[in-house]
């Protein structure tokens, strides 16, 4: 019987597997940030250990950095301590750090791919749940906890059990204006926020192949939001064209050899998946979440569902609780709902393609009265490229705030956050209660939909603005 891409990647990295024991995997890349690493480095220090492979370990500051200044003190005392600890730890243990003043600094899941640290066939870990992003390149990438961060720093290995496999095929062509964010939200709407639990998901089908690498990263980034361990897209010419010439990508003859190997990284035709889900891309409309998990999502032109319409009692109770928290009524359309803030950024949607899509809607328009809209590029290189293209001027002229790179309003760990009761159209990945600030209300959308909300003051069907 044939093997899935996940099975091939897993088996290629097994270092040791004894009967009735969890396999030990080799880790090719370890990405580190300021929040989940301090205790891990302290553990090394306490035991007198070194980082086993500093050349395969890369660090940046992203979660609690200010997006308005490069002052390490700007986000408060705890943030300052975490960033100073990262500086100290990377210097002591010989780890490459992209600090606040480095031109490549940015969100860890943006800088890895754009520097070519992320390559097909790798195992990649980070103390961050959205490490699944890197699976867009055909790499097995997943988030780990702080104790596991220490284990990888010390040994370059990690114990991992085998996951079940899920194939999600999106057939046909996506309509004009439908983005990877709409596709993945539609998928999660179908599977539910726990539909992928215990699985590694492989995304495939004509609509997936048509996506850029930025789009595929958005897709895999949110695999975790359906409960999956990781998300994968098999590498192809789109992948290779994106990677060629990047700093850490192979060069010359090594490049040719790498591509030859990367072309083998796909599921066999006769591979068996534990679960298969199929969607028709032609049926996907712009998506907006209405509740407090990413699976509580509808098309922008649909009505908010009545909790009584859910047959499952847990879903019914969850929907009722979500509507109360979000201060929404069943039966209304989100196009009638006003917003207070707009956030365009995060490891889901802060790449150059995302900013271009938002700028296309913002151009020649103005942010609605009473709305604060911020645009946060995912890295220094993204910011530089956007400014070379004049996107910053488009946003600023429209009334958006143009910020410095960082995780920003995706999570309330810095100065960018919602006040209680504020409603936000956000391009991030989680709409949990309090995620963007205590009692804040988050609606997940694509960058174009976020820009449309900014200029209309409410959720709007971006297809009507184009």
Swiss-Prot record:
<comment type="subunit">
    <text>Heterodimer of LeuC and LeuD.</text>
</comment>
<dbReference type="InterPro" id="IPR050067">
    <property type="entry name" value="IPM_dehydratase_rel_enz"/>
</dbReference>
<comment type="similarity">
    <text>Belongs to the aconitase/IPM isomerase family. LeuC type 1 subfamily.</text>
</comment>
<dbReference type="InterPro" id="IPR018136">
    <property type="entry name" value="Aconitase_4Fe-4S_BS"/>
</dbReference>
<comment type="pathway">
    <text>Amino-acid biosynthesis; L-leucine biosynthesis; L-leucine from 3-methyl-2-oxobutanoate: step 2/4.</text>
</comment>
<keyword id="KW-0411">Iron-sulfur</keyword>
<dbReference type="GO" id="GO:0009098">
    <property type="term" value="P:L-leucine biosynthetic process"/>
</dbReference>
<keyword id="KW-0456">Lyase</keyword>
<feature type="binding site">
    <location>
        <position position="407"/>
    </location>
    <ligand>
        <name>[4Fe-4S] cluster</name>
    </ligand>
</feature>
<dbReference type="GO" id="GO:0051539">
    <property type="term" value="F:4 iron, 4 sulfur cluster binding"/>
</dbReference>
<feature type="binding site">
    <location>
        <position position="410"/>
    </location>
    <ligand>
        <name>[4Fe-4S] cluster</name>
    </ligand>
</feature>
<dbReference type="GO" id="GO:0046872">
    <property type="term" value="F:metal ion binding"/>
</dbReference>
<keyword id="KW-0004">4Fe-4S</keyword>
<dbReference type="InterPro" id="IPR001030">
    <property type="entry name" value="Acoase/IPM_deHydtase_lsu_aba"/>
</dbReference>
<feature type="binding site">
    <location>
        <position position="347"/>
    </location>
    <ligand>
        <name>[4Fe-4S] cluster</name>
    </ligand>
</feature>
<dbReference type="InterPro" id="IPR004430">
    <property type="entry name" value="3-IsopropMal_deHydase_lsu"/>
</dbReference>
<keyword id="KW-0100">Branched-chain amino acid biosynthesis</keyword>
<keyword id="KW-0408">Iron</keyword>
<protein>
    <recommendedName>
        <fullName>3-isopropylmalate dehydratase large subunit</fullName>
        <ecNumber>4.2.1.33</ecNumber>
    </recommendedName>
</protein>
<keyword id="KW-0028">Amino-acid biosynthesis</keyword>
<dbReference type="InterPro" id="IPR015931">
    <property type="entry name" value="Acnase/IPM_dHydase_lsu_aba_1/3"/>
</dbReference>
<dbReference type="InterPro" id="IPR033941">
    <property type="entry name" value="IPMI_cat"/>
</dbReference>
<dbReference type="GO" id="GO:0003861">
    <property type="term" value="F:3-isopropylmalate dehydratase activity"/>
</dbReference>
<dbReference type="InterPro" id="IPR036008">
    <property type="entry name" value="Aconitase_4Fe-4S_dom"/>
</dbReference>
<dbReference type="Pfam" id="PF00330">
    <property type="entry name" value="Aconitase"/>
</dbReference>
<comment type="function">
    <text>Catalyzes the isomerization between 2-isopropylmalate and 3-isopropylmalate, via the formation of 2-isopropylmaleate.</text>
</comment>
<keyword id="KW-0479">Metal-binding</keyword>
<keyword id="KW-0432">Leucine biosynthesis</keyword>
């Amino acid at each position: 019987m044939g093997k899935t891409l996940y099975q091939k990647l897993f088996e290629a990295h097994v270092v040791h597997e004894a009967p009735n024991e969890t396999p030990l995997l080799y880790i090719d890349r370890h990405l580190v940030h300021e929040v989940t690493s301090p205790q891990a480095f302290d553990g090394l220090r306490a035991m007198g250990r070194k980082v086993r492979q500093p050349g395969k370990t890369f660090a940046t500051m992203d979660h609690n950095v200010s997006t308005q200044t490069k002052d390490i003190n700007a986000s408060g005392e705890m943030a300052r301590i975490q960033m100073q600890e990262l500086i100290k730890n990377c210097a002591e243990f010989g780890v490459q750090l992209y600090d606040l003043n480095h031109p490549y600094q940015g969100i860890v899941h943006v800088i890895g791919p754009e520097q070519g640290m992320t390559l097909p066939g790798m195992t990649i870990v980070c103390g961050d749940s959205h490490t699944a992003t890197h699976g867009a390149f055909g790499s097995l990438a997943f988030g780990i906890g702080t104790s596991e961060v220490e284990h990888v720093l010390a040994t370059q290995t990690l114990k991992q059990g085998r996951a079940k496999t899920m194939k999600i095929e999106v057939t046909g062509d996506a309509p004009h204006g439908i983005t990877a964010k709409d596709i993945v939200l539609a998928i999660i709407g179908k599977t539910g926020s726990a539909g992928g639990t215990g699985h590694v998901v492989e995304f495939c089908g004509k609509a997936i192949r048509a996506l850029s690498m930025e789009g595929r990263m958005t897709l895999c980034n949110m695999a975790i939001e359906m409960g999956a361990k990781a998300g994968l897209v098999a590498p192809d010419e789109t992948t290779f064209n994106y990677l060629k010439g990047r700093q850490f990508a192979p060069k010359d003859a090594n490049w040719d050899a790498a591509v030859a190997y990367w072309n083998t990284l796909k599921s066999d035709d006769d591979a068996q998946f534990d679960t298969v889900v199929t969607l028709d891309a032609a049926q996907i409309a712009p998506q907006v979440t209405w509740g407090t998990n990413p699976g509580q999502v509808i098309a922008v032109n649909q009505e908010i569902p009545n909790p009584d319409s859910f047959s499952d009692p847990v879903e019914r109770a969850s929907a009722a609780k979500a509507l109360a928290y979000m201060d929404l009524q069943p039966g209304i359309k989100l196009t009638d709902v006003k917003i207070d803030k707009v956030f365009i950024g995060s490891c889901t949607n802060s790449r150059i393609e995302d900013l271009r899509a938002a700028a296309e809607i913002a151009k020649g328009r103005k942010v609605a009265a009473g709305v604060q809209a911020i645009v946060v590029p995912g890295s220094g290189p993204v910011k530089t490229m956007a400014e070379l293209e004049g996107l910053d001027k488009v946003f600023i002229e429209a009334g958006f705030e143009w910020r410095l790179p960082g995780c920003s309003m995706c999570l309330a760990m810095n100065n960018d956050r919602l006040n209680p009761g504020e409603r936000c159209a956000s391009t991030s990945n989680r709409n949990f209660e309090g995620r963007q600030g205590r009692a804040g209300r988050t609606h997940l959308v694509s960058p174009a939909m976020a820009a449309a909300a900014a200029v209309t003051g409410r959720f709007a069907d971006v297809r009507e603005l184009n």
